[in-house]
Amino acid sequence: MRPIAIIDYGMGNLLSVQKALDRLGYPVEVTDDPGEITAAPGVILPGVGAFADAMANLQQKGLVAAIREVAERGVPLLGICLGLQLLFSTSEEGGQVAGLDLLPGEVKRLPAGIKVPHMGWNQVRFPRPGALFRGIPGGTDFYFVHSYYIVPREEEVVTGTTEYGLEFAVSIQRGNLFGVQFHPEKSSRRGLEVLKNFGELVRHAGNAGH
């Protein structure tokens, strides 16, 4: 299996994600090279920080077109934390900022009156089956650090929700697109299982393509 590409655009906890996949036995490469990203059998878009800065960095490095090509070709693509948010159309962070627009919906700030960022362990419920959560019971705790949340326009893409001031989507799946708001690489054994499930999706997609 060729390495899974972890996109380096200057705004991710790349080492933790890389170490987690190494531990699981999947070959990985951290790269900002569009050619390596489009050639990879699976791609991970991590990220922490501001939405507008992230989009600016992706544009500057010529990675927006590469990510869109990966998505259109049916290659498994996983967004983590800010990486999940970037998959959507727009964010209200820093005004109205355009995202990758791979999924219709917007990113909103968590409501006033609760402690922001939402930081720590929280339960995730599964409103419908998701391939990332295979073998994981509903109500499992995962580790979060975020101030904004996704509002998908299509309810059927939502595979996980949590409650913090309000109930909101924290996991999506549509075709080859996957995303989680929590940090699987910081979520202990269950988080590793999420990454393993993604790794197996990549492996099977690669086998099916040959």
From Swiss-Prot:
Answer whether the UniProt record assigns the keyword Transit peptide to this protein: no
Catalytic site: 81 (nucleophile), 183, 185
First-listed, main subcellular location of the protein, grouped into a coarse class: cytoplasm
Q: Which SUPFAM superfamilies match?
A: Class I glutamine amidotransferase-like
Location in or out of the cell: Cytoplasm
Q: Outline the extent of the Glutamine amidotransferase type-1 domain.
A: 3-208
Signal sequence coordinates? none
A molecular function (GO) term: lyase activity
A cellular component annotation (GO) from this entry: cytoplasm
- Listed GO biological process terms: L-histidine biosynthetic process
Subunit arrangement? Heterodimer of HisH and HisF.
Q: What is this protein called?
A: Imidazole glycerol phosphate synthase subunit HisH
What organism, scientifically named, is this protein from?
A: Moorella thermoacetica (strain ATCC 39073 / JCM 9320)
- Show the taxonomic lineage: Bacteria, Bacillati, Bacillota, Clostridia, Moorellales
